[in-house]
Each structure stands twice: as structure tokens, then as C-alpha cells.
Design a protein with these regions (language model features):
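Active-site gating loops and adjacent loop-to-helix segments of metal-dependent hydrolytic enzymes
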Residues: 17-44, 77-99, 149, 236-242, ...
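Mid-to-C-terminal alpha-helical segments outside catalytic/metal-binding sites
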Residues: 2-9, 18-61, 262, 268-273, ...
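Catalytic pocket-lining loop regions of alpha/beta-barrel enzymes
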Residues: 149-153, 160-273
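Histidine-centered divalent metal-coordination motifs
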Residues: 10-16, 187, 219
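Active-site gating/metal-coordination segments in enzymes
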Residues: 75-186, 191-192
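Conserved, mostly hydrophobic/aromatic
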Residues: 10, 54, 112, 154, ...
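Divalent metal-dependent hydrolysis catalytic cores, especially in the metallo-beta-lactamase
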Residues: 30-76, 88-96, 121-129, 152-153
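Acidic-and-aromatic substrate-binding clefts and catalytic sites of carbohydrate-active enzymes
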Residues: 39-45, 70-73, 101-104, 130-137, ...
């Protein structure tokens, strides 16, 4: 029966339309280069929008991955400080900003968990950010979210959050996830400063150190997809979603449909899940894109659409 299930393994939600609109318009998908015809949706990431799309597309579960960046939040808040502050005033305001950021990530994650209790078709993956919760605080927060708020997994985005995926500040968080047996879904792809923080090869040291950790490398490596197969072959505890990248098969830096399908086949289609990256893309569009891929059998595509996520994420 699980073969017939449809699961969106990568979606985002926001507490208000304004919050979703700001996040969506402020986050540019640039890494694939130019493409003449890019799919767009008018949605801004509200709960009602997603539930409507799930019903329309026949999706029974959606993984809600919280996207939060202390680095971005801090930069925006510091830039908004009034001019003419004394050094003491600036330090005080900055300390207040950091305290607000810590409370904000906790609040956002609790909201996601509460949402999953109200709507059982939504599955909460909470944000981890060592720039918001330094030292052991991040691991302690994740443990609290899993044990007391029913979080099912963790979301990371090194390029956006401004840390390398193998930054050892993350080690306590990875250890907590490994001990709790909860998976991580992590953005992968290049960053604008070419630091390689979230490229597939940036995961190697982390994967060496935590061989029992289930890690989903999102977007099949995105604009760095050429690196993905080597990581998949080296680390059997890695899994993947094809969200976003499946919309960019006519771009300068993305794979062609043939190359994308071959990559999925070479990795092993049972290790790959469908995700929409809602509200950047629609659910039915993302499903149709998977079904349009060459090479793969109908059975493989149907499992990518749903059953693989059940197995990989333990739904």
C-alpha cells in the first residue's frame, strides 16, 4: 500500500502571509543560471495554501522544514539600528538582537511542532542553527523539540545559515540526532561567496564522524550536482530529494532531464524522494516533473513520489 502514498518530502510554511512573502521574495534561486521558462507559484507559504494543494494533488503527508538563519536575521536587525549610537548603546542593542534571535528560533520551531499536532498530515522538521544557539544550546533545543514537542527531524541550510556542514560546532547537534534516531534534511548547493559550505563534498567530514546519522542531501546537490554521486557512493547513510533541481533541467548549470534521471538511477532510485520546495513551486507541478523524467520505470517514479519517504524518514 505504501507504493501508492504521495509524500512531499520538502515544504516550507510561515506563520503569516507577510512572513512568507518576505522570505520568498528575499531568497533568490540563482545557482542554476538562466532558464527561459521557470515555474512560478503565487503562494506565499500559508498553512491553508499547502493543505489545499495537498488535497488537490493527493498528497497525504508533507514534511515541513523550518528555514531560519540567525546570520540573516542579525544582519537585517543590525543594519536597521539608528545612527549615532554610542559604543555601549550599540553593544546593548546587539545583545538584545541576539536574545531576540534565540527566542525567535525557539518560537518558530514550537509553532511548527504545534502545527503538526493540529494537522496530522504535516510533519515537523525543526531548524537547527548554532549561530542562534551556540555551544550545547542547539543540541539541547533539538532534544527538547523531539522529546517534548514531537519534532520528527531537523533542517539545516549551511549556505543560508552561514556555516559549513562539517563545522564542528554542529557535532553536539549531530550526535543528538544520531542518538535520537531522527533524520536531518540539509540544503545542498553552492553559495554566492564560493565557500562551499553546503556543496555535497562539504558533508564528507560530518558523514565520516556520524556513520549512523540519516542525512538527506536536498536538491540532489543543486547547482553542485556533479559532486553528488561520489558522496552517495561513499556514504550509504545519505539520502536525497529532487525538489527544485527537477524544475531547472533546461538551465545553464542544472542537469538535463536525461542527466537527472541517470543520476537518480546511479544513486539508486530508492534513496531519492520527491519534494516541492513549496511555496517556491507547486506540489502538482513537482509530481508531474518526476513523472516526466526518462529512463526511470513507472514503479521507480511512484516510489519517489511517496513510498521512499515513508521508508527513509520513518513516517
Amino acid at each position: 500500500m505504501t507504493d501508492l502514498i504521495r509524500v512531499d518530502a520538502h515544504a516550507h510554511l510561515y506563520r503569516t502571509p507577510e512572513e512568507g512573502y518576505a522570505e520568498k521574495t528575499g531568497y533568490e534561486v540563482w545557482e542554476y543560471g538562466d532558464q527561459a521558462d521557470v515555474h512560478q507559484t503565487e503562494c506565499v507559504g500559508t498553512v491553508d495554501e499547502l493543505l489545499l494543494q495537498m488535497r488537490s494533488a493527493g498528497v497525504s503527508k508533507a514534511i515541513i522544514v523550518n528555514l531560519f538563519s540567525a546570520a540573516v536575521s542579525r544582519k537585517v536587525a543590525v543594519e536597521a539600528l539608528p545612527e549615532g549610537l554610542t559604543e555601549y548603546e550599540k553593544e546593548k542593542r546587539t545583545a538584545d538582537i541576539d536574545a531576540w534571535i534565540r527566542s525567535e528560533i525557539v518560537s518558530f520551531n514550537k509553532w511548527n511542532c504545534d502545527l503538526s499536532q493540529q494537522h496530522r498530515e504535516l510533519v515537523a522538521f525543526v531548524a537547527a542553527d548554532v549561530n542562534a544557539l551556540p555551544g550545547p544550546l542547539c543540541a539541547e533545543h533539538i532534544t527538547d523539540m523531539v522529546e517534548n514537542y514531537a519534532a520528527t527531524g531537523v533542517k539545516l541550510h549551511g549556505a543560508y545559515q552561514d556555516f559549513d556542514m562539517s563545522d564542528e560546532r554542529l557535532w553536539p547537534t549531530y550526535q543528538a540526532c544520531e542518538e535520537l534516531n531522527v533524520p536531518i534534511i540539509a540544503h545542498s548547493g553552492p553559495d554566492r561567496k564560493s565557500r562551499g559550505f553546503a556543496e555535497p563534498r562539504a558533508f564528507a567530514k560530518m558523514l565520516d564522524s556520524f556513520p549512523q546519522l540519516r542525512v538527506v542531501i536536498a536538491h540532489l546537490g543543486g547547482g553542485s550536482w556533479i559532486q553528488t554521486l561520489d558522496i552517495a557512493n561513499a556514504y550509504p547513510n545519505t539520502f536525497f530529494d529532487c525538489c527544485e533541481i527537477v524544475a531547472w533541467t533546461q538551465s545553464e548549470n542544472g542537469p538535463t532531464e536525461q542527466e537527472l534521471a541517470q543520476l537518480i538511477r546511479d544513486i539508486g532510485s530508492s534513496r531519492v524522494m520527491m519534494g516541492s520546495d513549496f511555496p517556491w513551486y507547486d506540489l502538482d507541478y513537482s509530481i508531474d516533473r518526476v513523472f516526466s523524467l526518462p529512463i526511470l520505470s513507472m514503479e521507480e517514479k511512484e516510489r519517489i513520489i511517496g513510498a521512499n519517504a515513508v521508508d527513509i524518514l520513518g513516517l
